[in-house]
Amino acid sequence: MNYENITIRSMTNTDEAAVCEFFDAMGGESRAFFNRMNTNRKHAVSFCQTPSQKRRYFIAELDGKAVGLVFFLDWNTKIPELGVAVRDEYQGNGIGKRLVRFAVDFAKESDKGGIILTTHIANIRAQALYEELGFSCLGTYKNAKELIYILRYTDAI
């Protein structure tokens, strides 16, 4: 399949059903890594219903199907927090890398100073991607189940 045809666009109030379907399709590992306690789903659906200036959400589509999400929390700060997820059956095809690069470029063009994110300590594939793209691991988060990564634009790809 040609993944070059993926489009990344801002999420709108018409995307609620696609967002719900995206989260419903997540397998156990994806839920554990990305949607523990259903928090990311709740925030994404809430954003569809009532957009906030403190957040930015984007949806990646292929043939009309949501194959990825990328979002920023705390957008009104100099270094917002990034979240990325790829639909299970599309993982391992470079879509996550494309979404992170999109996010890096978008934040940089918006005069942000960098990006911060957390990832589950067992999510080795994501850690490798973030490090490949120039993120530095700062250590474990207070719950010791997540690692904190930062990308300062002086370090960027």
Regions found by a protein language model. Name each.
Residues 6-19:
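A short beta-loop-alpha structural element at the N-terminal edge
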Residues 10-13, 24-83, 87, 154:
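Acetyl-CoA-dependent GNAT
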Residues 74-82, 91, 113, 143-145:
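A conserved beta-turn-beta hairpin within the catalytic core of GNAT-like acetyltransferases
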Residues 83-92, 119-120:
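A short, internal acetyl-CoA/4′-phosphopantetheine-binding micro-motif in the GNAT/acyltransferase core
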Residues 92-105, 128-132:
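Conserved acetyl-CoA-binding loop-helix of GNAT-fold acetyltransferases
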Residues 113-127, 131-133, 139-157:
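C-terminal "cap" of GNAT-fold acetyltransferases
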